[in-house]
């Protein structure tokens, strides 16, 4: 039986900060990264000089600085070789994520007790940030990953402040279907934040330093690296980062075993977490979060379908292993960048996947038909740095108009024909389901499309407000 003194629950024995079981292994891993960094940095800068979006002035600077970078690369190689030989075997001992606990002064929301508070709302957010190593990020016309990470972190805090000292408020229950809104602000009262493409570890740490003290526990540096079955050499993690305003109880990560082209070097997969939300009849009220980022190349729909099937199996397995007798489940939410839309013929396989029979997508009416208020979430990279696309308020106003959507939202894959009216390609999803037999029922209150990160990434941010109420 759980009492008020058990809040927040103690999870030190389950979620330790270091991904290594012994401090010596953690120290060796830090040494390996230090040895690899000079070569990594020089190579990253060289790659960035030849990005298609590089300006002529940068190309001229690259010609002058290229010799210095090559010299640094050569000087760093004798350090990089032992660093790599140390780094590779350590990956077999590494837990596939880092855990940043909140500071001792952290105060979580008051536990939800349905006997006293009939319903509670929870706000979820998903965003693809394109925080790659700086050289690779330039290929998406998004340089300066470290500076962008700082600004993104500050912007995310704007979504936390309205409800730092209490639970997210629910409006009175309203009849009818939920609606969607387009806003220039970050969704208010964030409870759960799932970020994708946070590949650069320095950028990830900048975000963690912002989120952990102000929101709560954070899972970052997620992925299984090094030599993996296939065989694959995974050089980058999954890019996933999960932050929660409620205490984390358990977490796990599975890497997709199938990947092609550039994704073969990336540890994409499914990050699952269990959070405690409150107490009902002396037992825990919990929720499940499943964060993912699927295979990117458009033509690999069959591979994405296999990944969808795998993540459904992994989600079921994680939930079955985590549940305890008597506890109530408020929700199971699957969110992230699925890299397919619900409007293109090229994605017919994914659009008909059983995922949409297991989880509800509030933006979707049926196959190839979205709600009239749903909006595409991928922006055109060619217009990212125009004044309108770099201003949250100006971009919001532009996307309310058909002309603006044609100009600033990415077009169909492979240059296909645009639908009329054109609402863009929605790649970022927040889906949910209720648990069979549960006394707690989740319902969508609102879906939010946000331009708050305009100029900082090539995706819109998506938010979902979910109202969970107890059966009377």
Task: Please describe what each predicted stretch is.
Residues 114-124, 236-250, 265-294, 472:
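Beta-strand-turn-beta hairpins that frame and shape the catalytic cleft
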Residues 127, 195-196, 292, 335-337:
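Active-site flanking residues adjacent to catalytic metal/cofactor-binding acidic residues
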Residues 204, 217-240, 244, 249-267, ...:
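Lumenal/extracellular "mature" regions of secretory-pathway glycan-modifying transferases
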Residues 231, 261-262, 416-421, 450-456:
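Short proline/glycine-enriched turn/loop segments at secondary-structure junctions
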Residues 297-436:
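Metal-dependent phosphoesterases centered on the DNase I-like endonuclease/exonuclease/phosphatase
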